[in-house]
Amino acid sequence: MRLFLCEKPSQAKDIAKVLGANRKGDGCWQGTDVCVTWCIGHLLETAPPDSYDERYKRWNLADLPIIPEKWKMLVKPKTASQFKAVKRLLGEARELVIATDADREGEMIARELVEHCRYRGPVQRLWLSALDDASIRKALARLLPGHETFNLYHSALGRSRADWLIGMNMSRLFTLLGRQSGYQGVLPVGRVQTPTLRLVVDRDRSIADFVPVPFWTIDVQLEHAGFGFNAQWRAPEDACDDQGRCLNQALAQQAAADIGNAGTARAVKVTTERVREAAPLPFDLGTLQELCSKKFGLGAQETLDIAQALYETHKLITYPRSDCGYLPQSQHAEAPAILAALQRADASLAPLQPYLEPQRRSRAWNDAKVSAHHGIIPTAAASDPSRLPAKHKAVYTLIRARYLAQFLPNHEYDRTQADFDCAGHALRAVGKQIVEPGWRRALPEALTPAKGREAPPAQVLPALREGQDCTVQGLQLKDLWTQPPKPFTEGDLIKAMKNVAKLVDDPRLKQKLKETTGIGTEATRASIIQGLLDRGYLVKNGKALSATPAAFSLIDAVPRAIADPGTTAIWEQALDMVQSGEMTLEEFVARQSAWMGKLVERCSGMRMTISGPAAGAAPPWKKKRRGGGKGKAAAGKPRQPRKKATT
């Protein structure tokens, strides 16, 4: 029997249909000499400390660090029946095809079962990027040898064990240190969650410490040949800060008076350049979460859940947990069929049809930049998006629009910059004249990538020549204040986690971080943020995230290395080295274990002052063990709701 092992029931059903395995069995779909079974996420979990020694049931500083000599895995009680079915089928199989998600975690979900159940037969890998019938058939025709993806398993296993070492040891350590100060709650510490929390704490402190500074601007309304437009006063450099803002009120007031009295402004320099903008890349998960947060107010986890449903349930998009926006060259051959399906499914795309060029290859098609997964794009299994729930439709429309944009011309416009002299003061006007809408026909203005504060004003300038005079129609002298940094939204935090290199000063570390995925992965960032919200470290007010008092206290107490975004990003790079074979799993775990021992020794004598939940929660060792989801090392949660208090 040939056994296909999938990650979830819905995935198994889709693959079984293509294989003709239509008979429902015990935890599987059966066909002629083929069987398709499934996991329900991880069927196994890393054993808790008390599985290694009974004394670890009680939390004690003297027992730290806890470092297993031989790691144990336990069957999750909630899914034990499915584990039994998978174990039985592995015992009967003559050949195994791993068909879990095509990523590190999917590899681990399957391989840990193969190892635990001692399957020794041949292994192949089904590498799927979409779950529509055509994509499944294509992947079945190109099965990979099992050894090609084995290191993904060791990379995921290394991540899991590092999470366990830090979560179990540091959470116990800081919870016990907190108890010495009278704090009765649990203080969970994580390899990824703590640096993420520090990002928010640092941002909140920047906001709290911000001192506003006044500055002045002058907007001038000019007119030429009956055509009105706006220009801005350009203050002398010695009167401005590094952002070009005038800090001299008297100078601004004098300039406003002079400009108002002058009556005319003379054009001294006029330049026009043709600007060509390529279409934005298809989405990776992070950029999709960022834009959905900004545009729709969706949380990171909510966006991921919607994308997962569009992938698994509706079969409308490719694999969503991708960290790459590029597409393989081979995928371009499928473009005509996908474009035709999209247009058949939605009549509202008809006005776009004359402009689409299926043969066009945008910069998105680049084999050199494609990682394990390509950008998130629609599949040929398109259907009318109006039948989707409102939020699902909104997310799908974004993904579809980014794909359609790849087959439209560049967006082109003429950017004109006109400099004026007005009573000895410099003015500047910037105009934009669209020449070719191009890919913006597919993307509403609000959904295109933001260009920041330097975007040209949305105005068209009249035909101007140097030496021409324009009439001053009016002006506004504005008294403004510098603004503090904005609180993080979930989308902003996802972006900061990805681009953590920008927050690191060390040039060598910064360069290394630019080559990594930042804090966490595309698949885990949403759950990290949600976990911080669930544990009461973060609160959400509208779209804005802010840290609680307990978060400030914890970040101040933990060793800098644990809370430093640069450190955790380097760990992710080490996991990439395990994946590529440059470092062994054993070497990675040994380094983590040695580092953990040093941290425990250094921190055991600390004294803490904690703000957070009220006293009175049950001791952590009396709580029932709580199982974590993908990528989590559960360290326990207080049963009582968190309350604001200071101990």
Language model features with spans:
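Basic, low-complexity terminal or inter-domain segments flanking catalytic cores
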Residues: 2-3, 79, 116, 171, ...
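C-terminal or mid-to-C-terminal helical accessory/interaction module adjacent to the motor/catalytic core
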Residues: 71, 78, 84, 91-92, ...
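C-terminal accessory/connector segments of nucleic-acid motor ATPases
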Residues: 210-235, 262-306, 489, 511-512
